Amino acid sequence: MAREFSRTRRVGQQIQREIALILQREVKDPRIGMVTVSDVEVSRDLNYAKVYVTFLQLENDAERIKEGLKALTEAAGYIRSLLGSAMRLRVVPELRFFYDQTLVEGMRLSNLVTNTIREDKRRMAESGREEDDAAPDETTEDNA
């Protein structure tokens, strides 16, 4: 019977919290800037951890993201050593950093939906139809 939260998931959540604190308090590299640890996936044998991060910035600058990931990769050994002293694990996972695209993709999809709704309203206004006319009333009364 599978448990609701496996050990690897619990370890991943703890690693996420610890790395967030380490990045906030210990790592002083200006290339990293404001970074958020959005998720950590740990391998079943706890030897590797994929750390998904997002960078707080005004626009999505691919060069700054690449530079931030490079800085995190260079600091991975230091972060791993601090992680080892903060957590009681027999093996501290090797850290691999990845940029988390979900926030950017979510914003892109939200903008697409907003633009589609705006375009539909504009087309209805041009054709002289009201919003209420676009969807006929589907409610019927039952005489039962």
From Swiss-Prot:
GO molecular function per UniProt: ribosomal small subunit binding
InterPro entries (alphabetical): KH_dom-like_a/b, RbfA, RbfA_dom_sf, Ribosome-bd_factorA_CS
Region feature Disordered, mapped onto this chain: 120-144
Gene Ontology cellular component list: cytosol
Entry-linked SUPFAM superfamilies: Ribosome-binding factor A, RbfA (SSF89919)
Gene3D superfamilies: 3.30.300.20
Cytoplasm recorded as keyword: yes
Record function comment: One of several proteins that assist in the late maturation steps of the functional core of the 30S ribosomal subunit. Associates with free 30S ribosomal subunits (but not with 30S subunits that are part of 70S ribosomes or polysomes). Required for efficient processing of 16S rRNA. May interact with the 5'-terminal helix region of 16S rRNA.
Protein name (record): Ribosome-binding factor A
